[in-house]
Amino acid sequence: MTKRDRTIYSCDACRSRKIKCNRQTPCASCHKSKRDCVYTVSRQRDAQITNRKLDKKTYHQISAIEKKISALEGKKGLLQVETINFNKSFTDQTPLVELQSLFPYLLLSKQDPGCVLVRHHCHHLLEKDPRYFEYSQLLADLSLTKRHHLTARAKALLGEAYIPSPQEGHTIDQLKHVLSLNPNFRFAGNFADPLTSFFSLIPPAWANKQLVDTFFQHIYPVIPIIDETDFNTSINRVLGPQIDGHYINSFPSIGSADDLPFLALFLLVLRISYMYTPGACPVSYDTLRAAETIMKEFDITKTHSLTALQAEIMLRFYKIVAPESYTQSNYVQVSVGVLIQNCYSLALHRDPEYIGEHNPKQQHLRRKIWHLLLRMEVIDSAIFQTILSSNPDASDTKLPQLIDQAPPMEQSIVKHIWRSTDLFVSLRKLVEINSKTSEDTPLETVLELLVEVETKLQAFLATIDSEASTVFYNDLVIFSVNFLLVYMYYSLYLFKGPTPLGNKYLLKSAQILFVDLARTRSTSLFLAYFNLNYIHLVLMITNFLRMRVDCIIHRHLRAQDSSVQDLQCCRYFLKIIFFSHVKELGNYSSSHKYAWQMRKVYLTLAKIMERSSDVLISNDPELVKSAAVDIPVKEINKLLEQYINFKGFTPTTLFDPTDNELIDEMQHENLWNAMENIEYSEKVYSGWIDAIKNVPSNWDWDYWDFLKIS
């Protein structure tokens, strides 16, 4: 028989003396005799008896180990979990603010010790010349004689295509005539009264049919928010009959208020399609301005129709990716927020089945619009670090379903929405952590989420097929996810500092930037916007690294250490990459305003970095010392050399331009100044506000805010 494991109710002292115990703590007997009152269960008592039988040495060893275990278990609860906040300084935990991001991920420039030196130096330069960043450094030092010579030569070379500078005193009509020689910037009609001049703004009917077909064949997969059949039906109803491919009406047929946003939507579809495939029958820039004029009639405080929401989404899409636009984070934040709130007012966050919508086509359309906007704001947040406006917990809208006998393109779009859903769910969690300011996040949570996003990205890539209709959508997802991964891993490197783990994060960020993203290519006009953001990311990171390398070389030379060969090689590679991309921005500047704005900033930084010793002298030695920490230079050199070979870059110069290069630079500057003057002078105001329309607009950047350290 085995003994029963009884529970002991008497304390050890009373049990050993075989007296009655009142079972208190302490019991009456122990209290009276001032003894320790201990209640030991039978198994523990057996262990005590066993311990007595052991030799004293072994017993003391076991007791010491038990005490250490108890002490460690006590400390375990006191250990602090390592946390991170991406919106606070990693050195002193002060809040970091970037009120108006000129370019994506500028918060990194306030975290990186090397770039902090550059920001301090730029601040000193701006104190001397507040407009230091506002002009091209290639043109800044030109003498008046040289400028006159270049202007005369440009007029001789370009003839009518020469774009005059604001100082040459041309009228707005003369500027529009010159710019109209560029197919992207044709002007036509009175966009301030889009109904009266509607048919003068658009091409003939035969050309419009081709443009609409182009939209649904190539652009629709990226922004599938309209139904092709309904759209073509509305075109015929509103624009009226045709004879020999030309409209015969002189005024659109407006049957209801909903036809106004349809006209704006139609104008935007034409302009987007033309920018995708410029042809013999151009769609003027005024079609965009006419669409904007129409949409101003829809007050954001009122509930809109679904058609108005579609037009708003299309307008926002165009303004972000259009070559003549320049998008900052404040516009991205406000515009997507308004769209999300309009979706709530139209109940798009509730599944159509639950609100009495039984038309399968409308159900499908409403679901696509809602889930497209959810993805759109996550992509915006991943790139511009904007705050999410939607609440997925308040939505029960199902994913779009595959429809029997649907066109292959529509089936492919639905499949890609399903395939990318898991990835966007994880990406959303990551951007929420990135934008969190009120509390820190456990570092382990961030690392687990990064692994999850990378795993799901690879799973998404494995599902990609060769269908041309979905190429843009795939690239859009790949770009936005990898952009954020570069930012997050580089932030983790700055957080961990010069440690083996920190260096691992630096190499991970560099691998994605210089290898994974370098292989993502697209010739789409609309993805040129993402290509430009990629160039910005490369320029920003290479500038950080170059300043850090200069600081390390400075430290070695002061210590009379001549072993800087790898560091000098790294600086050489970084300079090749930086100069080559700044030159590439010059090629983009003839058609993309964003590229021109970016080129001015990075030309200035290139000029500053050519005299990096001035940066070191103008900064506190302790700041220089903090930037002079070692980096895994050999591993970085391999990635940089591989990137240079892949891109075909060769050593080039920036600050010894030929006359033709200077003429190009002047023409780019004149182009965007002329566009700004035209837009400002012809801006459409309400009648009561016309009296103050001559007040200068505040369109320039606030460089002082840009250079604030915190």
Swiss-Prot record:
Keywords per UniProt: Activator, DNA-binding, Membrane, Metal-binding, Nucleus, Transcription, Transcription regulation, Transmembrane, Transmembrane helix, Zinc
Topology in the lipid bilayer: Multi-pass membrane protein
CDD domains per the UniProt record, alphabetical: fungal_TF_MHR, GAL4
InterPro entries: Fungal_TF_Env_Response (IPR051430), Transcription_factor_dom_fun (IPR007219), Zn2-C6_fun-type_DNA-bd_sf (IPR036864), Zn2Cys6_DnaBD (IPR001138)
SUPFAM superfamilies recorded: Zn2/Cys6 DNA-binding domain (SSF57701)
Record-level GO BP terms: biological process involved in interaction with host; DNA-templated transcription; positive regulation of cell adhesion involved in single-species biofilm formation; positive regulation of cell-substrate adhesion; positive regulation of cellular response to drug; regulation of DNA-templated transcription; regulation of transcription by RNA polymerase II; single-species biofilm formation on inanimate substrate
DNA-binding region: 11-37
Keyword Transcription regulation: yes
Outcome of gene disruption: Leads to increased drug susceptibility. Displays decreased colonization of mouse kidneys. Shows decreased yeast cell adherence to silicone substrate.
GO cellular component term, pick one: nucleus
Main location: nucleus
Pfam short name (any one): Fungal_trans
SMART domains for this protein: GAL4 (SM00066)
Residues annotated as transmembrane: 475-495, 525-545
Record function comment: Transcription factor that controls the expression of CDR1, the major multidrug efflux pump. Required for yeast cell adherence to silicone substrate and plays a role in virulence.
Protein name as it appears in the record: multidrug resistance regulator 2
Biological source species: Candida albicans (strain SC5314 / ATCC MYA-2876)
